[in-house]
């Protein structure tokens, strides 16, 4: 079965957050600036959810010439006073690092009343769990496996949360392209980054997946000190999962990657067995 969000207008995670913001800001007459990094998909959904809303601006950072022309046009042809698109020289990781740096600088973030709709915002992860419950109740199956196209590990981490809530999920399968850090981490324990290569699936052209840190936190027994030390090693590009941690991950996760030739073949040969939900 195929669970497909065909239209950006159906991006419930962003619509939910946008409506939350508008509701609570109307109560206290406050104003916020949303800063978001995108590899293509998040930006389109977030813009559609935030445009024309009162007391909100949205600034979208995308990597210059590293998103698809369709994604760029969806984002950059929106002519609303509260929507600002900014192309950044570099890749998605560079955009994401800028947003993280702004959040860490509390003087700056408070001064501009900054907030976000990336998966930095926990509300977005919670909203994404809805997909999994919808699929389960639509199929009325006893147990499901989910294969999820994965770049920043947000959607599939939401599936992990759904499983922890009690949803009967067997395996969560990370599907990624040749920027394969998540596949290497889950299959071999190798979480060292390489140079990002441009592909035909630019939304997955990411090396360091932010939400993988949340999974590391979980498998370390929710120990923030251990997680902090591990993430310091990640920043030094010197971290490999130990056998115990890898075994914990493999209880819930599997992974696979496709190179560019395999991706093109898949694009041109849709499976007749796909049944949309």
Cite the ranges covered by each PLM segment.
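A glycine- and small-aliphatic-rich helix-loop capping segment at beta-alpha/alpha-beta transitions
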Residues: 14-26, 49-59, 76-78, 163-169, ...
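Well-ordered mid-protein domain cores that form the structural environment of catalytic cofactors
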Residues: 5-9, 13-49
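Domain-scale recognition of functional cores that engage charged ligands
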Residues: 96-101, 106-163
